[in-house]
Amino acid sequence: MFVKICGITTEEDGLLAVALGADAVGFVFAPSPRQIAPQRAGEIARRLPPEVLTVGVFRDAAREHVAQTVNSARLRAAQLHGHESAESSQWVSERVPVLIKAFAAGDKGLATARDHGADIVMVDNGSPGSGQVFDWSLAEGAPDGVRLLLAGGLNADNVADAIAAVHPWGVDVSSGVETSPGHKDPRKMRAFIAAARAAAPAPYEGGEEVPYDWQDDLL
């Protein structure tokens, strides 16, 4: 089970998330209590092991800005978390190593996720980072075989049920492992990662365990 910890704002939290077993960390560049400057995100990312997927999160930003920011900060992925068109998403996907395209639960666009050129497809609630849980059956609209990353109100207490209901490729958490917005709780992170891995210890069989070889990308 692929685990992403989003909303990292400090080097300490980034290093700790990875030490506890996170496969990916997210840096929010969109307006948010967890917003971080791209330069600072890049500094933190450079302290992390090369196998970690470092993700810049954007919401309805200009596509040129997305590509330039991700590459300047030397991040490994862009996450588009707004109402980006398939054409804009495709454009970004051709200019960054990995693209994550997020859809709100119930969004009819989820059925056409493949048109966005995304390596990973996320399903979240309509208010990212709010901690609100949505009806997990709404994730069933994702195309078969995509790497589905489930988000939206997950925490150590409900992630096992979410995995059992949706069978995602990975899970994403932010507020569910915090003491306050942007400040991660070590115990909550440990508990969340342990619960997710216990619920689905084996890789998702519908695709590769990870979307590409992080090590090769750095050569």
Stretches with model-predicted labels:
Residues 1-219:
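Conserved N-terminal beta1-alpha1 strand-loop-helix module at the mouth
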